[in-house]
């Protein structure tokens, strides 16, 4: 303050001058001791001035720098101008120098001379002129000679020869390139350029003579080189073309050959002139046309002889070999060409560019390539018929296949197979007797054919050639023998090669048994690689194959538990065994089974010999017509085998599947089985054959397992051998056996409740699956289950086909459920064919031989695929919606416990709805027996329907349409109509309708329900179902689309944690399927069992199981009744929840359930209700069954459970419907568990619970809820429409909450997971709250 005051006072008088002027540095220093405001002002002025000066100086410097830049740019511009001047000068000088070459001077000299001459007297001019003219003319002539190249006037103009000077001047004077022989002129500006006047041009005259002569020689050599190059180019061109043609079946190779022939003929003229050059071109082409022809003829003969053994083994091998040989000829062609072309010599090099592509082979092989390939296609068959030759050729062909990348050559082999293999299949139809053996060799790899049988054969052949390469000929042969067309060749190869092939197959089977031990690992690798390779060709099929090969690989591990059963597969299907190393592991048993398979193959061979009568067995028509019994049966068994590999791949039916796989993967075994079965088929019917296959697969396949199975298997065999009544009788027996085995299953299920689903699954797998395998063999429901399983896999596999295939899968699942035997007889073939139709959307593109391949590959492609779904439907039968299950089967297959569930369920569902029947068997074995016989009747009715389908592509399309006569029945319509309420409102519910309908109507209207869906809601139901199914099968762990679904997915993840408790699912399944017998019906009665049972009865009417399906569904109805709040989720849940949701929910609850379920399963609903109170607390499982109706009181528990998700939905949903939340909670838990992989789980489950509580009568809606699993949201809209007043608000909340709280559910998903993992009751509350609004929506009504 003092300083301020003082300065102010001091500066007061002088403040203005001090403040206004900038201070000097000296003043600032002086005032530093007594700083004042004036000093601040002065300092500010000083700083401002300094800043301004600095800025001004900076600007000045900037201007200077800009000036420098401008100057620099100007200098640069001038420099560039100089450069340009030099460039212009260089151009000018160069031109001047060139023109200045004596030529310019000469005319000038001439002109001067002329002028001088003019000036002189005429005499003088003449005198002077003569020498000058002579000199000029001579010089000009010299210039013309030296500077110009006088094209041969003789060649150019014969007339101009007379006028030498004129002709030469006027005509063909071409300036010579002076710099051919001499260096270019010096660079302008170079030292030499500056130093020498001629700038490097003056030496021309001295060099002209040598230049001219050199030029002539050089030009000649150049012309020769050009000619050679053109020849070589032509050779390369023809080679390239031939490469393309070779890939294209070398149809155009003849053109190349023709080109080579003509080129050679044209070149022959040149050869006449330039034989010397042609000797050089010999490298690329024959010395002369005659030599080339001789060489080609000899080369063709030799090449054919050499190639046919190598390439003839398979049309594939030949294209491969053609490519490889061509490539090899190009480079390695020395050996082949030495042999092939050794006489002409022509042409290793000639054809190494030419030869491999065009040379020998263009002339010989190219020309004959078509013939060779085609003849190879045909001659392959004869040579392949020669077992030794085919084996040897096979080795060579597979070796070439090895040489050729599986991807690349296989692709072309795909093409060649399209042409060679595909056309070979077409040729196979007539020639398959011939070709099958060849195909054996090429298609040894068909192990992949397991799934793709014929597609696989082509694809697998493409890929199998590489794949079979590891196993090489032996494996390839054995697999090829069995799998030559795995389905087609099985019959045709066996038919054609039945003596040879049978012997070789028997030997090969033995070799396989041996090799499979060693090769099983490689083959397992192969199948995956094959399937992978096949992916390129058949993405869908390969997906299924990959799904199955990979799944089968894992399943094979599980199935390896079934080595005894697997050995049969091993012996019969090396590659399938390869595919299922499960079987590969059991090499010894494989050998034993191989013996069985060999016996079967021998029987097959006899059958095939019989079929040889119609060697066209695989001609689509014949195959479909008479081969349908065998072929379809084979397809069915293939479907089973394919589905079964997956089932066996899955732990669920690993043994049963392994046994099934034995038949399934032993498509040959099945063929062998079919051989036996075919014999029996011929003796009995397809039905018996189907069951023969089952019996055979059950006996042979189950032969090792049949220890427990044999009585039933024998019964099955007897039944299958019995008249077509086998279906009904067999199913009745199966019903009895199924009841027994179901009772056993129930016991084992109870045990599983006690021991946990895993143990039970395994024990059931071993015991029940053996039984169920027997039953399944009896029912072929094992195969229907395996087919469902394949279907389940198929959805996974079929992404493209999924819409149709899934619909087909649903139909097939339902049909399988409806008619396990129908599915055996029909489901396999029709299913295979319908799916193959789907496949052949791809395969038809791939292979023109759609019919044959539809017959074989259809079954094969979708035998595996379809059958997988079929297997899953049996699994799904428990789940009610196996198709949905199949959709979720990938998810299910992911959780082994779920798979085990499936196994148990499959065991139960092995009788197409033994799962349902299992509860029914608990409820009453009578119903099961009744229902199954009814199913057999329906199956008989439907089986003929579908049996017809496979015969024609139309039938296949119909199968794809999943039109069930039963579905068209009024009862089916009524059932569908019940389900419909959900369907029309909900696009997804339509798919869910199928699912739930599949649950309900899988037993009753597997086909009709699907047909009902497809007809009542044709577009939505089928398309949506398939689309949802496709998604679902992709669903694995796909994140649910809706918040609610995501919430459920979160719960699923926690339930996935809960999956550690597999017992719960088993217990729950047993309870859901068994104990719900009482309880689910109670729930159903409570929750609308009337409508559900009406729907069931209506749906059952087609099955003649009106009451039984009601009861039969009551397992589902039980699940549905309970699952309305609870079981319906399990219906969708049981389809998925039992498989997945129940599994995980019961995993959550398994402990409480397991404790209670062992006692409760017989008690059914009541025991389960008490269980579910505990379970409701422990998990949503109790609520799933009981809380739907009994458990509304458990709102509180759901709220605790929902606390996690309740946070999401609690405020709105819990308040609105705690009861709903309880039942839906359980359902959600179940569904969440079910939909651990669920995308649609939350959607489907939430609507399921809503639907359950809204209308227990909507059990069809519950089935729709199963569909809702796919179309959860769509179900919700229905529910909204149903209880629009409260439901809308609730659904606004529910939908909004489902979505908004679904978002919350997303946040609470972790909570749900932790809640499920740790506080399971909380999880139920979450579920309840999640579904609180849906439950309230139902409850509100």
Swiss-Prot record:
Enumerate the residue ranges of region (Disordered): 202-405, 422-554, 621-664, 696-739, 751-838, 881-951, 988-1205, 1302-1326
Q: Where is this motif: LFa 6?
A: 572-583
The annotated region (Required for interaction with CCDC22 and VPS35L) lies at 356-742
Residue numbers covered by motif LFa 21: 1330-1338
Q: Where in the cell is it found?
A: Early endosome membrane; Cell membrane
Q: Which domain of life is it from?
A: Eukaryota
Motif LFa 13, per the record, lies over 856-862
The record places the motif (LFa 4) at 482-491
Q: Where is the composition biased (Basic residues)?
A: 1028-1046
Show where the record puts the motif LFa 20.
Answer: 1290-1299
Name of the protein this chain belongs to? WASH complex subunit 2A
Locate the region Sufficient for interaction with CCDC93.
356-600
Motif LFa 3: positions: 450-463
Compositional bias annotation for Polar residues: 518-536, 1135-1145
UniProt short sequence motif LFa 10, positions renumbered to this chain = 726-738
Q: How does it assemble?
A: Component of the WASH core complex also described as WASH regulatory complex (SHRC) composed of WASH (WASHC1, WASH2P or WASH3P), WASHC2 (WASHC2A or WASHC2C), WASHC3, WASHC4 and WASHC5; in the complex interacts (via N-terminus) directly with WASHC1. The WASH core complex associates with the F-actin-capping protein dimer (formed by CAPZA1, CAPZA2 or CAPZA3 and CAPZB) in a transient or substoichiometric manner which was initially described as WASH complex. Interacts with VPS35; mediates the association with the retromer CSC complex. Interacts with FKBP15.
């Amino acid at each position: 303050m003092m300083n301020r005051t003082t300065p102010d006072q001091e500066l007061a008088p002088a403040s203005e001058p001090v403040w206004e002027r900038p201070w000097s540095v000296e003043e600032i220093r002086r005032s530093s001791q007594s700083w004042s405001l004036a000093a601040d002002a002065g300092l500010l002025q000083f700083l401002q001035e300094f800043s301004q000066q600095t800025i001004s100086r900076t600007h000045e410097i900037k201007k200077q720098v800009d000036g420098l830049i401008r100057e620099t740019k100007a200098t640069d511009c001038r420099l560039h101008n100089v450069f340009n001047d030099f460039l212009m000068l260089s151009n000018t000088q160069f031109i001047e120098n060139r023109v200045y070459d004596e030529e310019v001077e000469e005319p000038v000299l001439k002109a001067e001379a002329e002028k001088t001459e003019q000036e002189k007297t005429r005499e003088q001019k003449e005198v002077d002129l003569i020498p000058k003219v002579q000199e000029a003319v001579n010089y000009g002539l010299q210039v013309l000679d030296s500077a110009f190249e006088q094209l041969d006037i003789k060649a150019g103009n014969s007339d101009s020869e007379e006028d030498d000077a004129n002709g030469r001047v006027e005509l063909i004077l071409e300036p010579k390139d002076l710099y051919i022989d001499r260096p270019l002129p010096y660079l302008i500006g170079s030292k030499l350029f500056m130093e020498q006047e001629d700038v490097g041009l003056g030496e021309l005259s001295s060099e002209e003579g040598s230049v001219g002569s050199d030029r002539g020689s050089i030009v000649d050599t150049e012309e020769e080189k050009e000619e050679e190059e053109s020849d070589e180019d032509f050779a390369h061109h023809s080679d390239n073309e031939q490469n393309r043609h070779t890939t294209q079946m070398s149809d155009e190779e003849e053109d190349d050959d023709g080109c080579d022939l003509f080129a050679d003929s044209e070149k022959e003229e040149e050869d006449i002139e330039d034989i010397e050059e042609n000797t050089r071109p010999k490298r690329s082409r024959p010395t002369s046309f005659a030599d080339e022809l001789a060489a080609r003829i000899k080369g063709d003969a030799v090449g054919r002889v050499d190639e046919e053994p190598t390439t003839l083994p398979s049309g594939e091998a030949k294209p491969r070999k053609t490519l490889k040989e061509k490539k090899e000829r190009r480079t390695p062609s020395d050996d082949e060409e030495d042999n092939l072309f050794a006489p002409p010599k022509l042409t290793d090099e000639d054809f190494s560019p030419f030869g491999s592509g065009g040379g020998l082979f263009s002339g010989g092989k190219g020309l004959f390539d078509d013939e060779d390939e085609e003849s190879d296609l045909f001659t392959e068959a004869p040579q392949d018929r020669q077992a030794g030759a085919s084996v040897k050729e096979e080795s060579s062909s597979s070796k070439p296949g090895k040489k050729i990348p599986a991807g690349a050559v296989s692709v072309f082999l795909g093409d060649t197979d399209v042409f060679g293999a595909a056309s070979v299949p077409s040729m196979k139809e007539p020639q398959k007797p011939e070709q099958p053996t060849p195909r054996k060799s090429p298609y040894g790899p068909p192990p992949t054919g397991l799934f793709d049988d014929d597609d696989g054969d082509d694809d697998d052949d493409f890929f199998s050639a590489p794949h079979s390469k590891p196993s090489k000929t032996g494996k390839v042969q054995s697999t090829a023998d069995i799998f030559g067309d795995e389905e087609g060749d099985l019959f045709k190869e066996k038919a054609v090669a039945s003596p040879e092939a049978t012997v070789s197959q028997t030997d090969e089977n033995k070799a396989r048994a041996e090799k499979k031990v060693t090769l099983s690992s490689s083959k397992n690798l192969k199948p995956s690689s094959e399937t992978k390779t096949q992916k390129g060709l058949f993405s869908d099929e390969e997906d299924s194959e990959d799904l199955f090969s990979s799944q089968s690989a894992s399943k094979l591990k599980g199935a390896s538990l079934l080595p005894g059963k697997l050995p049969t597969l091993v012996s019969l299907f090396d590659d399938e065994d390869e595919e299922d190393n499960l079987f590969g592991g059991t090499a010894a048993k494989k050998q034993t089974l191989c013996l069985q398979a060999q016996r079967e193959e021998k029987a097959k061979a006899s059958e095939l010999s019989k079929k040889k009568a119609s060697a066209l067995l695989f001609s689509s028509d014949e195959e479909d017509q008479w081969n349908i019994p065998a072929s379809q049966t084979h397809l069915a068994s293939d479907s089973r085998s394919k589905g079964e590999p997956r089932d066996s791949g899955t732990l669920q039916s690993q043994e049963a599947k392994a046994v099934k796989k034995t038949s399934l993967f032993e498509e040959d075994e099945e063929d062998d089985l079919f051989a036996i079965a075919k014999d029996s088929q011929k003796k009995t019917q397809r039905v018996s054959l189907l069951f023969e296959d089952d019996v055979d697969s059950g006996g042979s396949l189950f032969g090792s397992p049949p220890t427990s199975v044999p009585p039933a298997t024998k019964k099955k065999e007897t039944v299958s051998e019995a008249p077509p009544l086998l279906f009904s009788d067999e199913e009745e027996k199966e019903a009895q056996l199924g009841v027994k085995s179901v009772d056993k299953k129930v016991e084992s299920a109870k045990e599983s409740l006690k021991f946990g689903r895993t143990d039970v699954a395994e024990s059931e797998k071993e015991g029940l699956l053996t039984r169920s395998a027997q039953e399944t063999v009896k029912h072929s429901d094992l195969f229907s289950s395996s087919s469902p399983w394949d279907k389940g896999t198929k959805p996974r596999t079929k992404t493209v086909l999924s819409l149709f295939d899934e619909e087909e899968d649903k139909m097939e699942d339902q049909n399988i459920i409806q008619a396990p035997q129908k599915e055996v007889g029909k489901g396999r073939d029709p299913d295979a064919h319908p799916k193959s139709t789907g496949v052949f959307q791809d395969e038809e593109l791939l292979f023109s031989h759609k019919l044959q391949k539809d017959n074989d590959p259809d079954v094969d492609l979708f035998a595996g695929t379809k059958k997988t779904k079929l297997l899953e439907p049996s699994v799904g039968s428990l789940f009610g919606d196996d198709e949905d299950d199949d959709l979720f089967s990938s998810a299910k297959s992911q959780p082994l416990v779920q798979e085990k569930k499936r196994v148990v369920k499959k065991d139960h569902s092995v009788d197409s709805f033994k799962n349902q029947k299992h509860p029914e068997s608990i409820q009453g074995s009578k119903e099961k027996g009744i229902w199954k016989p009814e199913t057999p009747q329906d199956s008989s009715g439907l089986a003929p329907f579908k049996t017809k389908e496979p015969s024609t592509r139309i039938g296949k399309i119909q199968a794809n349409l999943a039109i069930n006569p039963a579905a068209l029945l009024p009862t089916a319509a009524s059932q569908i109509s019940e389900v419909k309420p959900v369907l029309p409102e909900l696009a997804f519910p339509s798919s869910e309708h199928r699912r739930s309908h599949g649950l309900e109507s899988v037993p009753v209207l597997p086909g009709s329900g699907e047909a009902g869906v497809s007809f009542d809601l044709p577009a939505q139901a089928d398309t949506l179902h398939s689309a949802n199914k496709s998604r679902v099968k992709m669903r694995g762990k796909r994140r649910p689309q809706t918040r609610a679904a995501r919430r459920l997915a979160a719960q699923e993840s926690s339930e996935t944690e809960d999956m550690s408790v597999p017992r719960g699912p088993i217990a729950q399944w047993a309870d859901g399927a068994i104990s719900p017998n009482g309880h689910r019906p109670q729930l159903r009665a409570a929750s609308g069992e009337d409508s559900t049972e009406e729907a069931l009865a209506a749906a059952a009417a087609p099955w003649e199981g009106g009451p039984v399906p009601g009861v039969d569904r009551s397992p589902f109805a039980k699940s549905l009744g309970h699952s309305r709040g609870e079981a319906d989720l399990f219906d969708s849940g049981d389809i998925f929840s039992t498989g997945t949701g129940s599994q995980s929910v019961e995993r959550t609850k398994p402990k409480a359930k397991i404790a209670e379920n062992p006692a409760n399963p017989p008690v059914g609903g009541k025991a389960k209700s008490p269980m579910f109170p505990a379970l409701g607390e422990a998990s949503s499982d109790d609520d799933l069954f009981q809380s739907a109706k009994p458990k509304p009181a458990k709102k509180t528990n759901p709220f605790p459970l929902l606390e996690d998700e309740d946070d999401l939905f609690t405020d709105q949903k819990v308040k609105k419907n705690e009861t709903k939340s309880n039942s839906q909670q359980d359902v959600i838990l179940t569904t969440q568990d079910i939909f651990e992989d669920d995308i649609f789980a939350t959607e489907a489950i939430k609507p399921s619970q809503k639907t359950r509580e809204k209308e227990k009568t909507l059990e069809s809606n519950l089935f729709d809820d199963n569909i809702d699993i796919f179309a959860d949201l769509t179900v919700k809209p229905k529910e909204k429409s149903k209880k629009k007043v409260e439901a809308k608000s609730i659904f606004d909340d529910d939908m909004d909450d489902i979505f908004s709280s679904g978002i919350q559910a997303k946040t609470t998903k972790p909570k749900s997971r932790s809640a499920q993992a740790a506080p399971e009751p909380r999880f139920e509350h979450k579920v309840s709250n999640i579904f609180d609004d849906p439950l309230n929506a139902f409850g509100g009504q």
